Regions:
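Asp-box/WD-like beta-propeller blade repeats and closely related beta-sheet repeat scaffolds
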Residues: 126-192, 199-200
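Blade-loop segments of beta-propeller domains
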Residues: 87-134, 145-154
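Residue-level detector of Asp-centered blade-edge/turn motifs that repeat once per structural unit
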Residues: 76-79, 117-120, 169-172, 229-231, ...
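Short, conserved, GDST-rich strand-edge loop motifs in beta-rich repeat architectures
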Residues: 177-197, 284-317, 369
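Blade/loop signatures of beta-propeller domains
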Residues: 17-61, 196-197, 320-322, 326-329
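Surface loop/turn motifs at the tips and blade-to-blade linkers of beta-strand repeat domains
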Residues: 62-67, 104-109, 144-160, 215-220, ...
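Conserved beta-propeller blade signature
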Residues: 81-83, 122-124, 174-176, 233-236, ...
Length: 390
């Protein structure tokens, strides 16, 4: 009889939990946390700092103007053809040399974000709210992974990839990628900035056995990923904290991460290699004193989220971005922007190819292109990564 009573109580508790679980989670999900951002250098034009924006992106040539919605990332193949994702779940290919002709290369679904070619010519993509996908040269779409190991302390199942964002591929074929937040799907990515909880993670997918492993956890919106030129480490962006980290794959620091750039005036997005041994980084937006102040007052943000309609919330300034070049040590080399915001206000990606830089933006309706002064006119990403393998 006692056992029967215990079972009845357990069932009752379980039913009440299932019925009210959403209320508990909603209470948690509207609870922003405290963050004190460090002081930063000015990005104002003419300020004389390494971050001072110019107007270089404003005069970039437009590719696919009016044909595209949301080319978050861009990439080029060995034939100089240009690829990007769209918010309609498509991978679009623009044909070289003038990029005036295009086609839907593949329909993946979701929102294709980060892109990378592997050694076999497969186009690998982080697809928002869906997972990591591969598109073969024959356009066959294959899901690689959609989950990782669940955290032991999680109330909600966080094994599913909610916002897979960017990726890069090591020489051994392993795919390193970010899942920006455990709390929001890709279409609600900006809401993560309001709470600013450290739930972003860095993961690795091994094609040899199909396994997915979480390498790092507890970052504020992990974003861009880029293998270092020597492949002994990788860089990844922590957007809401305005930092760039290096994760070591080899050597005495293997398995450990260190911050190489901190307290930037902009929110970092994708990172890619440059032909001169340095790296390109996109800024999706710029810090403001008002939003920085709000991060120190989580109660205010909680009241805002509960009492105001979303179109009246205070969000980060994602209407002004840019492109930054930095070196192995994290020193800033140059910064470029679109001061008027007419062509490339928000930049989420850039890709160097044969002396030109191609610009993508998740809220944009075009891809930008301009010549890079002093760049190697023969350098390409596929050749730098895979040499004569393909």
């Amino acid at each position: 009889m006692v056992l029967g009573l215990l079972l009845a109580v357990a069932v009752t508790i379980d039913i009440r939990w299932l019925k009210n679980r959403h209320k508990v989670l909603n209470e948690v999900y509207v609870a922003p946390v405290y963050l004190a951002m460090g002081p930063t250098q000015s990005a104002e034009p003419g300020s004389g700092t390494p971050y001072a924006l110019n107007n270089r992106l404003a005069v970039a040539d437009a590719i696919g103007l009016g044909e595209l919605e949301g080319p978050e990332d861009v990439i080029l193949d060995e034939g100089d053809h240009l690829y990007c994702g769209t918010r309609h779940g498509e991978i679009v290919r623009f044909f070289a040399p003038d990029y005036t002709r295009s086609e839907v290369f593949a329909h993946v679904g979701g929102f294709p974000l980060g892109l990378a070619f592997d050694a076999h010519g497969n186009l690998i993509s982080c697809v928002g709210a869906m997972g990591l996908y591969s598109i073969s040269p024959e356009r066959e779409v294959t899901k690689l992974t959609a989950e990782t190991t669940r955290s032991l302390t999680s109330i909600n199942d966080d094994a599913r990839l909610r916002d897979p964002n960017d990726l890069d591929i090591a020489p051994d074929g392993r795919i390193y990628f970010t899942d920006s937040t455990k709390r929001y799907d890709a279409h609600d990515w900006a809401l993560d900035s309001i709470e600013n909880r450290a739930t972003g993670r860095l993961l690795v997918y091994d094609p040899k056995d199909g396994s997915t492993k979480t390498l790092l956890d507890g970052y504020r919106y992990t974003n861009g990923v880029c293998m270092a030129h020597d492949n002994r480490s990788l860089f990844f962006a922590e957007s809401w904290a305005c930092r760039i980290h290096r994760y070591w794959l080899e050597g005495p620091k293997a398995g450990h991460a260190e911050c190489v750039i901190r307290d930037m005036p902009g929110y970092p997005d994708n990172i890619n290699r440059a032909s001169d041994g340095r790296y390109w980084m996109a800024w999706l937006g710029m810090r403001t004193p008002t939003f920085d102040l709000s991060l120190r007052h989580p109660a205010m943000r909680k009241r805002m989220a509960r009492r105001l309609p979303q179109d009246e919330w205070l969000f980060p300034n994602i209407n002004t971005g840019g492109v930054v070049k930095f070196d192995e040590a994290g020193q800033i080399i140059q910064t470029m922007g679109d001061l008027g915001g007419a062509s490339h206000a928000m930049v989420t990606s850039m890709r160097e190819h044969k002396g030109q830089l191609f610009i993508g933006g998740i809220f944009n309706n075009r891809i930008g292109r301009f010549a890079i002064a002093g760049a190697d006119p023969n350098w390409t990403g596929p050749r730098a990564y895979w040499g004569g393998k393909r």
